[in-house]
């Protein structure tokens, strides 16, 4: 992915953990579109992206067309674990296809849903087995759609199959700075080498 994690070349789509990447100074504002608590359905249909000197709100597919990133890394699913796997994949597929239609020149990389630590008492409804099911379904979806799959979950998982406790806030599912750095390092060291297909990079907000 991230041999090109520079400037406007990569854009990260996510919810709360990507907000934390920005808040911890690990990525720039030009590199992400994120909002805490969103799932795939909201990401497709709601205007959650804004730009400076522009009062309009844009959906993620619309924003991708405006930002013209070389690559898009998508990390959704934490806020979707209450739905059936088939519904999650249907929403995710629709989101990917909307981005492809809006801006066909970007390489889409689908990242795994992050694991949760064994102690996630603040979020008792979260289920690691469901997350594993989501990630297996995401791999199959990527193969069917011809987009890339990134298994960053392996950088966060311990030998017990849960997230490494030191990477998470106690009793929580959100990553601390050390966990965020582990994810970002994984993205950077699992580079995807492709040609830059963008016709131009002009007029990026």
Regions found by a protein language model. Give the residues of each.
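Structural recognition of the beta-strand scaffold that forms the well-ordered cores
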Residues: 13, 31-34, 70-76, 107-112, ...
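Solvent-exposed loop/turn segments at secondary-structure junctions
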Residues: 16-20, 37-41, 78-83, 114-118, ...
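Oxyanion-hole/transition-state-stabilizing segment in secreted/luminal serine hydrolases
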Residues: 54-89, 114-119
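Active-site segments of SGNH/GDSL-like serine hydrolases
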Residues: 75, 79, 97-132, 154
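Generic structural signal for well-ordered alpha-helices
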Residues: 92-97, 135
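Catalytic His-Asp segment of secreted/periplasmic serine-dependent ester chemistry enzymes
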Residues: 116-205
């Amino acid at each position: 992915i991230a041999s090109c994690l520079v400037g406007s070349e990569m854009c990260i789509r996510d919810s709360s953990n990507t907000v934390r990447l920005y808040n911890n100074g690990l990525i720039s504002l030009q590199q992400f579109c994120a909002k805490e608590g969103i799932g795939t359905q909201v990401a497709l249909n709601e205007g959650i992206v804004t730009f400076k000197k522009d009062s309009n709100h844009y959906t993620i597919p619309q924003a991708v067309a405006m930002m013209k990133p070389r690559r898009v890394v998508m990390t959704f699913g934490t806020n979707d674990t209450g739905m059936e796997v088939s519904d999650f994949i249907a929403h995710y597929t629709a989101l990917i296809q909307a981005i492809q239609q809006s801006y066909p020149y970007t390489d889409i990389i689908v990242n795994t849903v992050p694991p949760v630590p064994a102690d996630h008492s603040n979020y008792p409804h979260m289920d690691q087995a469901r997350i594993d099911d989501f990630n297996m379904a995401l791999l199959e979806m990527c193969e069917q759609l011809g987009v890339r799959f990134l298994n960053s979950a392996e950088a966060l998982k311990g030998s017990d199959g849960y997230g490494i406790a030191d990477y998470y806030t106690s009793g929580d599912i959100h990553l601390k700075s050390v966990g965020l750095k582990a994810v970002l390092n994984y993205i950077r060291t699992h580079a995807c080498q492709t040609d830059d297909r963008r016709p131009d990079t002009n007029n990026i907000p």
